[in-house]
A protein has these predicted regions:
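A short core secondary-structure module
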Residues: 24-62
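A generic local secondary-structure boundary/capping motif
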Residues: 6-8, 22-26, 38-44, 68-73
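Glycine-rich beta->alpha junctions and the first turn(s) of the following alpha-helix
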Residues: 68-152
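Glycine-rich flavin
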Residues: 1-26, 30
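A generic structural signal for well-ordered coil/turn residues at beta-strand boundaries
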Residues: 3-5, 30-32, 49, 58, ...
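Short loop segments at secondary-structure junctions
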Residues: 12-13, 39-43, 57-60, 84-91
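C-terminal helix-coil-helix/basic helical segment that borders enzyme active sites and/or dimer interfaces
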Residues: 133, 154-179
């Protein structure tokens, strides 16, 4: 399930007004777009009340408190978001049904994340292979096992990516955590 949504939306003419906060968000680069869930307070009774919206970082009413000097995380541009009467036009509502949206994007999202991680791992392994004799070769015996694990994860990624719509959530999460 989802954690409680801390940004509330109110349907207004032409879109939504947002109020609330997001304690931790990453990739808050200047000129960027933020995608977030919103709990809509006045949604029609027979209609879902949790939406997914996009907000431009320079929109009026949005303040960002950047978390600077985080060990190894400075490049993530992370921070806390505060929304005060931020207007989101109707065309910036990605979905008015968060469950359906998450169902549709979870597999591709986790597969892309896993691909990035495996690509990084492949580069690291390629470079590490050049230095197996450093420190009297202490890591040489482990290297084939690490390569085998990498290859297994890569094969699982290819298998899941061949039919993402059929991929089980458990398998996607296991792959993502494995890399």
């Amino acid at each position: 399930g989802l954690a409680p949504i801390k940004v509330e939306g109110t349907l207004v003419e032409g879109g939504l007004k947002l109020n609330g906060s997001v304690s931790w968000a990453s990739n808050l680069y200047p000129g960027g777009v933020i995608v977030l869930p919103v709990a809509v307070q006045n949604a029609p009774e027979s209609h879902p009340n949790r939406y997914i919206v996009t907000v431009r970082q320079d929109v009026e009413g949005l303040s960002i408190d950047y978390h600077r000097n985080l060990l190894a995380l400075n490049g993530t541009e992370s921070g806390t978001l505060k929304f005060e009467d931020v207007f989101v036009p109707s065309e910036d509502v990605l979905s008015d049904n968060i469950e359906a949206f998450l169902h549709d994007v979870t597999a591709p999202f986790l597969l892309v994340q896993s691909s990035f991680c495996l690509g990084l791992a492949a580069g690291a392994l390629q470079e590490a292979a050049k230095h197996l004799d450093v420190s009297q070769g202490v890591f040489r015996p482990e290297f084939p096992l690490i390569l085998e694990e990498y290859q297994s994860l890569r094969e699982e990624l290819v298998r899941l990516a061949s039919e993402p719509e059929r991929a089980e959530r458990r398998d996607l999460l296991s792959l993502r955590l494995g890399v």
